[in-house]
Design a protein with these regions (language model features):
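Hydrophobic residues in beta-strands and at strand termini
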Residues: 88, 215, 280, 331-333
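Hot-dog-fold acyl-thioester-processing enzymes
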Residues: 1-83, 147-273
């Protein structure tokens, strides 16, 4: 796989951000900040349209990455998400039209397993990169899962989707790489005055109010549909156990979306985050009978007076276990 690092392609069609899709995704991640729902609230913060939740880019990224995991990254039975980094160069708003790029950016061998990182870049029609998303997954082979899982998935999953189809190395494979040229990074995320607390009013060590998020199996099914995530480990108990899990688990991206909403509920401005990095440690188990409770807490780790920015650490726990190994958000203060 190392020889395929650098493989790149751009989708032929652009992705247009729909106003109702913004609201639909915000509802799926339980983010009720007014800027995701109400134009007047978004305009008050200086936006030209409804602001997307920070993790919204996972929707077009998942669709764009499908070809990569079907034809370029080969030899694995399934994948487990481990890390995610969102770089918000400027907030994405409704009616933005985005070019979506995909690049296999690294393959690392650690403790006998391959860690595969894919980078998605989102460029607006003005030619400026507005968002960069780095996704790291662990490639899982047949030795790590019950052999019955393949037939179980095929009998359960919707038509035209086969997440466990293992492609072999293709002798006709041809590597395509990112074309050379200047990359222009949008600066809208650093020039707009954020609607966050004043830098002078926050201190290192300040704690964010604790928030609890409840998840049911219905929430997981809804998120699967909204985000286009067909993996049945998020709604089928039998398949989850065949995959070596204790029960159905929440999407890692859903727990990250809840975390981003937790931060913006405190800060007052979802577009004030310039970077959000999460390392997952344990999945959030969602039982059919009781669902799951996820507790989010946070504190200001550091402050930079030169840029009036800070780093906030967010912790997430469910069932007495940490589901975030480490999560940090870089925030602009007013």
């Amino acid at each position: 796989m190392e020889s395929r690092v650098g493989h790149y392609y751009r989708l032929d069609e652009t992705y247009r951000v729909g106003r109702e899709k913004v609201r639909e995704y915000a509802r799926a991640v339980q983010d009720y900040h007014p800027a995701h729902w109400d134009m007047a609230a978004a305009e008050k913060l200086g936006y030209s349209g409804l602001v997307t939740p920070l993790t919204f880019t996972s929707i077009p990224a998942m669709a764009a990455n499908r070809y990569l995991f079907e034809s370029v990254v080969v030899g694995y039975d399934t994948y487990m998400q481990t890390e995610e980094v969102f770089e918000q160069h400027r907030p994405i708003v409704a009616d933005d039209e985005l070019h979506v790029d995909v690049e296999l950016s690294s393959v690392r061998r650690i403790a006998g397993r391959d860690l595969i990182t894919v980078t998605n870049t989102f460029t607006d029609t003005a030619g400026e990169r507005v968002h960069t998303l780095h996704t790291t997954v662990v490639g899982i082979t047949a030795e790590d899962v019950d052999p019955a899982i393949k037939s179980a998935v095929q009998n359960t999953i919707m038509h035209d989707v086969n997440i466990l189809e293992i492609a072999a190395a293709d002798a006709a494979y041809q590597k395509t790489v990112r074309p050379e040229g200047e990359i222009r990074i949008a600066d809208g995320g650093t020039t707009r005055t954020p609607g966050t607390p004043s830098f002078d009013d926050v201190q290192v060590g300040d704690e964010l109010p604790v928030r609890h998020a409840r998840l049911s199996r219905g929430d997981l099914v809804n998120y699967s549909g909204v985000a286009g995530d067909a993996n049945p480990i998020h709604w089928d108990e039998n398949i989850a156990k065949l995959a070596g899990l204790p029960d159905v688990i929440a999407h890692g991206m859903l727990t990250m979306g809840l975390g981003a909403g937790f931060l913006s509920a405190w800060s007052g401005d979802p577009g004030a985050v310039t970077r959000y990095a999460v390392r997952l440690s344990q999945p959030a188990v969602v039982s059919a009978a009781e669902g799951a409770d996820i507790e989010y807490s946070g504190r200001i780790k550091s402050l930079d007076p030169a840029t009036r920015t800070g780093v906030v650490i967010v912790a997430a726990k469910s069932g007495g276990r940490k589901i975030f190994g480490l999560a940090t958000l870089n925030v602009r203060f007013s």
